[in-house]
């Protein structure tokens, strides 16, 4: 099932038809199929090899596999997943015109966030557009991941290299189940400068 906020806001970032869309720390998200169905070429990046296998198994697709340095490239049609460390991926391996982050940056502790921004910047061409979905909650109420990523921190981390626009913030209903007093999700449009 596709993420509701992706379906609602993808058109807002105005990604070019056929754009190569980067999906960092993609796991086995079905959102990649949805983006592919919109006419995009998808490049996911995932550290856990089992998640890559599960993605293609669930899609009932057998990918071509090729070793590229420290990464393995799994390709089936317009979908590619590079299995390996996002932070060691060379820029030319995933040069993208658009990107989608539903759970990547919130999976990282605060000490790794600037490195993440730097790597996204290096993997995207100037003018690239991104859609990022974050979570915010009182961090002391839950260890994470997902970690809390307040809107102000997103702006501070990206502002020097991206034009940042907050598209929407929604109150999530499952905060009580997680033992949280409040849980929000924000959607950002980011344009690489």
Where on the chain are the PLM-derived regions?
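A short, conserved alpha-helix within the catalytic core of class I
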Residues: 107-119
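Conserved catalytic-core segments centered on acid/base and nucleophilic motifs
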Residues: 32, 42, 99
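Gly/Ala-rich phosphate-binding loop of Rossmann-like dinucleotide-binding domains
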Residues: 36-37
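Class I (Rossmann-like) S-adenosyl-L-methionine-dependent methyltransferase catalytic domain
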Residues: 1-18, 28-31, 44-91, 117-119, ...
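Class I SAM-dependent methyltransferase "Motif I" SAM/SAH-binding loop
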Residues: 22-29, 104
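Short active-site oxyanion
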Residues: 19-21, 40-41
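A short acidic, Gly/Pro-enriched loop at the edge of an enzyme's catalytic core
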Residues: 91-99
């Amino acid at each position: 099932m596709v993420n509701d906020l992706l379906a609602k806001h993808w058109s807002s970032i105005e990604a070019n038809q056929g754009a190569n869309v980067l999906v960092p720390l993609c796991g086995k998200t079905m959102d990649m199929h949805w983006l592919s169905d919109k006419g995009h070429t998808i490049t996911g990046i995932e550290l856990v090899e089992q998640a890559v296998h599960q993605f293609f198994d669930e899609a009932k697709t057998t990918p071509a596999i090729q070793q590229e340095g420290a990464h393995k490239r799994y390709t089936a049609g317009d979908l590619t997943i590079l299995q390996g460390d996002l932070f060691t991926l060379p820029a030319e391996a995933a040069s993208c015109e658009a990107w989608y982050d539903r759970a990547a940056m919130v999976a990282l502790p605060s000490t790794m966030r600037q490195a993440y921004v730097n790597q996204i910047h290096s993997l995207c061409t100037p003018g690239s557009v991104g859609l990022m979905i974050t979570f915010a909650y009182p961090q002391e109420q839950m260890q994470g991941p997902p970690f809390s990523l307040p809107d102000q921190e997103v702006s501070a981390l990206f502002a020097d290299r991206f034009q940042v626009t907050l598209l929407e913030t929604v109150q999530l209903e499952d905060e009580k189940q997680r033992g949280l007093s409040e849980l929000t999700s924000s959607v950002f449009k980011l344009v690489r400068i």
